[in-house]
């Protein structure tokens, strides 16, 4: 559960309705893989990830980024039940993929940066603070199975 004020919840959902999940998702996952290159080990089947340009133009990175943001959209629709919303994904990432849960926090922070880049002055410090709460809640929900 994310503790947002009514104004924060309205602001994050209003902005989220404007997000192009394909563009933002691809950029967020691509940036994660470039900025934190050790995360690339989970994406061996994605082909060429040898340079930042290769990562950012990789069709599989873009497609998976869209998939990630579609799941995040489900969370945005269920901010009061993030653990339930992400229970199956938490189990998958813990038991089968063995993803370090710290990577969820890293991706959340990258997503906030990408949102700031895409929305400029619309992405006020107050909105950033609210989104930091959301991505922290999503990261905690995804890490829940690890506890």
From Swiss-Prot:
Keywords: Heme, Iron, Metal-binding, Oxygen transport, Transport. One of its GO terms (biological process) is hydrogen peroxide catabolic process. Heme b binds at residues 64, 93. GO terms for cellular component: blood microparticle; haptoglobin-hemoglobin complex; hemoglobin complex. GO terms for molecular function: haptoglobin binding; heme binding; hemoglobin alpha binding; metal ion binding; organic acid binding; oxygen binding; oxygen carrier activity; peroxidase activity. The keyword Transit peptide does not apply. Red blood cells. Residues 3-147 form the Globin domain. The keyword Transport applies. Heterotetramer of two delta chains and two alpha chains. Belongs to the globin family. This is Hemoglobin subunit delta. It comes from Carlito syrichta.
């Amino acid at each position: 559960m994310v503790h947002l004020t009514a104004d924060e919840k309205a602001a994050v959902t209003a902005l989220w309705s404007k997000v192009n999940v394909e563009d933002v998702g691809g950029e967020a996952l691509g940036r994660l893989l470039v900025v934190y290159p050790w995360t690339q080990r989970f994406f061996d089947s994605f082909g060429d990830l040898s340079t930042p340009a290769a990562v950012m133009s990789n069709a599989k990175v873009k497609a998976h980024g869209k998939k990630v943001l579609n799941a995040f959209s489900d969370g945005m629709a269920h901010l009061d039940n993030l653990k339930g919303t992400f229970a199956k994904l938490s189990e998958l990432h813990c038991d089968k993929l063995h993803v370090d849960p710290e990577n969820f926090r890293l991706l959340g922070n990258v997503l906030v940066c990408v949102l700031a880049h895409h929305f400029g002055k619309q992405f006020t410090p107050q909105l950033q603070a609210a989104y930091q709460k959301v991505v922290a809640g999503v990261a905690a929900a995804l890490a829940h199975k690890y506890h």
